[in-house]
């Protein structure tokens, strides 16, 4: 059998058919968190990037591989076409403005020796299907195409490809957002951040403004949740803090996240949040194998909707980096806007481990999700 590489990269209320798509990414995150040997690690992951790569693999799959991937997406066979249409429609809703930039790209690189079915090529080539020789400078060619389309450089290296590679799927997500109400950089100060291993000093950002927030209860455990809006984008960062953040994460579903967000009311907050930067380069093959094991098995994988050639997936990576500062997420400098409180604001300080979720609120797509254990 021939091997396939899938690489998903990121740099940061859906139609009902895509609820399984969203949930697959959440489940992958949960498996990463619960499988981490060191629970003191920061995590950043792109649920959308993961689910998108799995969905595009589904479009090529057949037989039991197709069944497993349909189950992963909680789709019936007859819903696959409409779900793909809804996915593309959802992507179109992620508008870009001068304050917020969202760029999602998909590239499928297929070796020139693989015979692609004409029907597959006709249907999907416009989404970024490329032919090349993986034994002739494939790394540089792939990086050049991906950088031209996404602006990201050096997304693959020689350790990710070898002479057996005939197919590489690369999904990139780049998000740059400016806060609706930026933190006042003059108020950033050193403060304590405490986890179960001790206390350290971190740069603590501060803003006093009206935000959406509330205390939510999950199985008698309380969590403070607040929503930070990005300017002119329909994208928000949700922050949650409490005594048992693993329990909080394990409780997340698309429906619950939608419900929690609906319970957030407008309040004046004196919000204190650490400035943080996280980068994770992660092999996620074992995570995907939990959901669709046959596509990694050379004797069982089937991608006959794309080709009759015997292919299977042998590697799956995700590289993600996120920077959060006073201006926003992966942000450029912008004018500071600070609202002053008319009454005594509620103080909320994220000085213990917390979870963050960057979500496109119209579609429900979770672009990024992670936890901050230390900074």
Swiss-Prot record:
Signal peptide extent: 1-15
Gene3D superfamilies membership: Alpha-1-antitrypsin, domain 1, Antithrombin, subunit I, domain 2
Classification via Pfam families: Serpin
Keywords: Host cell membrane, Host membrane, Hydrolase, Membrane, Protease, Signal, Virion
GO molecular function: peptidase activity; serine-type endopeptidase inhibitor activity
GO BP annotations, alphabetical order: negative regulation of plasminogen activation; negative regulation of vascular wound healing; proteolysis
Primary localisation category: virion
Topological category with respect to the lipid bilayer: Peripheral membrane protein
GO annotations of cellular component type: extracellular space; host cell plasma membrane; membrane; virion membrane
Binding partners and assembly: Interacts with OPG185/A56 protein.
Name recorded for this polypeptide: Superinfection exclusion protein
Organism: Monkeypox virus
Lineage: Viruses, Varidnaviria, Bamfordvirae, Nucleocytoviricota, Pokkesviricetes
Gene that this sequence comes from: OPG040
């Amino acid at each position: 059998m021939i091997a396939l590489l899938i690489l998903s990269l990121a740099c940061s209320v859906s139609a009902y058919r895509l609820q399984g798509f969203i949930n697959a990414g959440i489940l992958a995150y949960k498996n990463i968190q619960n499988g981490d040997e060191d629970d003191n690690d920061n995590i950043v992951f792109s649920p959308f990037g993961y689910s998108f790569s799995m969905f595009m693999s589904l479009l090529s799959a057949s037989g039991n591989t197709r069944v497993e991937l349909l189950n992963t997406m909680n789709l019936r066979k007859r819903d696959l076409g409409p779900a793909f249409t809804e996915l593309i429609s959802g992507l179109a809703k992620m508008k870009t403005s001068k304050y917020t930039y969202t760029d999602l790209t998909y590239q499928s690189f297929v070796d020139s020796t693989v015979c692609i079915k004409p029907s597959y090529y006709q249907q999907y080539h416009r989404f970024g299907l490329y032919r090349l020789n993986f034994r002739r400078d494939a790394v540089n060619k792939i990086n050049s195409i991906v950088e031209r389309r996404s602006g990201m450089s050096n997304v693959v290296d020689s350790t990710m490809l070898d002479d057996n590679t005939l197919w590489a799927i690369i999904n990139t997500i780049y998000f740059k957002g400016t806060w609706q109400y930026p933190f006042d950089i003059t108020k950033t100060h050193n403060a304590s951040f405490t986890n179960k291993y001790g206390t350290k000093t971190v740069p603590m950002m501060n803003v006093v403004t009206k935000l959406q927030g509330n205390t939510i209860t999950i199985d008698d455990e309380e969590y403070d949740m607040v929503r930070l809006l990005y300017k002119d984008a329909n994208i928000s960062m949700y922050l949650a803090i409490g005594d048992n953040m693993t329990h909080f994460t394990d409780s997340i579903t698309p429906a619950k996240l939608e419900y929690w967000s609906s319970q957030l009311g407008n309040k004046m907050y004196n919000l204190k949040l650490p400035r943080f930067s996280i980068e994770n380069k992660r092999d996620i093959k074992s995570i995907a194998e939990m959901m669709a094991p046959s596509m990694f098995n050379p004797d069982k994988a089937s991608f006959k909707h794309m080709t009759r050639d015997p292919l299977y997936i042998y590697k799956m990576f995700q590289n993600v980096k996120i920077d959060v500062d006073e201006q926003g997420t992966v942000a450029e400098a912008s004018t500071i806007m600070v609202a002053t409180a008319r009454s005594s604001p509620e103080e909320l300080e994220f000085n213990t481990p917390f979870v963050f979720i960057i979500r496109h609120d119209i579609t429900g797509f979770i672009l990024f999700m992670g936890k901050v254990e230390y900074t």
